Design a protein with these regions (language model features):
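Metal-dependent phosphoesterase/phosphodiesterase active-site architecture
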Residues: 206, 211-257
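His/acidic metal-ligating clusters that form di-metal
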Residues: 30-43, 125-206, 237, 241-246, ...
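Extended active-site neighborhood of metal-dependent phosphoesterases/phosphodiesterases
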Residues: 56-139, 175-185, 203, 225-240, ...
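Active-site environment of divalent metal-dependent phosphoester hydrolases
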Residues: 12-15, 52-57, 79-86, 120-124, ...
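A cross-domain feature marking catalytic cores of carbohydrate-active enzymes
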Residues: 48, 77-80, 153-155, 249
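N-terminal active-site segment of His-dependent metallophosphoesterases
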Residues: 1-61, 68
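Active-site-proximal beta-strand elements of phosphoester/diester hydrolases
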Residues: 1-13, 109-119, 150-152, 205-211, ...
Length: 257
């Protein structure tokens, strides 16, 4: 099986600029590259921060772009998003019984679980998984049984050694870890938020993240003049078979033929 992972697209209403780039242009180029070279992917996951300012126009623009994208997409929300506004535009996007943007997708061989780590409040950037969301996750993990299971979340539950990001990670990580223990065969966990390529092994579970499509977080803050840097964006090409998981972090801009 092949699927695509994208994160942190940060669209701006009216296709406006952001931090020296144009998010809509980056997304267009990303979709074009995926369609040309990986059109056989079974699905695509966009793991949050769909919009920079949680604007209805940004969500409407994303919806229009995805109508032209032949690969089915699972959309998640992040700290820059607004849950209610997102759901008012993407009315058919699945959610759980408490209206959190959480869902699961099951094939004959595998289970994929998508989490909503958005913490309510204006300009709140750390994440949470409340009791209702953790209860839902526990049920999904129990129902998954022995099937290989893959999780997707926006915020990481651990520090990554970048103070700015460590201050806005998912808190309540002990409760999250306890909930994970109900999964019998968790293979990997994908996340976003940090705007960097990372691989982390946390309490025996492996995690990986992607760069943003628009702007990146420097590993060392003092190495750049501003808050962000212009390292290359990438999307993930994920290949799964019976006994192997491979993730290609695919830089798609300015590829020389």
């Amino acid at each position: 099986m092949k699927f695509i992972h994208i994160s942190d697209i940060h669209l701006v209403s009216g296709d406006g600029p952001l931090n020296g780039c144009v998010p809509s242009d980056r997304l267009n180029k990303c979709i074009k590259d995926i369609s040309k070279w990986h059109g056989d992917a079974k699905f695509c996951v966009i793991s949050g921060d769909l919009s920079e300012y949680a604007e209805k126009g940004a969500y409407q623009s994303l919806k229009k772009k995805l109508l032209e994208f032949q690969i089915p997409c699972f959309l998640m929300i992040g700290n820059h998003d607004d849950r209610d506004l997102f759901q008012s535009v993407f009315t058919n996007n699945p959610c759980d019984e408490n209206k959190f943007v959480q869902s699961s997708f099951e094939t004959d061989e595998r289970v994929f679980i998508f989490l909503d780590t958005k913490k309510q409040g204006k300009n709140v950037h750390d994440g949470e998984l409340c009791e209702n969301r953790l209860d839902w996750l526990q049920k999904q993990l129990i129902n998954s049984g022995n099937k290989p299971t893959y999780l997707f979340m926006h915020h990481p539950p651990f520090d990554i050694g970048i103070p700015y990001m460590d201050n806005i990670r998912l808190f309540g990580s002990d409760q999250f870890l306890s909930t994970l223990s109900h999964g019998k065969n968790i293979q990997h966990i994908f996340y976003g938020h940090v705007h960097r390529l990372t691989f982390v092994k946390w309490h025996g579970y492996t995690f990986s993240s992607l760069t943003s499509l628009n702007h990146q977080s420097p590993l060392v803050a003092e190495s750049v003049q501003g808050e962000f840097c212009d390292e290359p964006p990438a999307y993930g090409v994920v290949l799964i078979d019976e006994d192997q998981l491979t993730i290609h972090f695919n830089n798609f801009l300015d590829r020389k033929p």
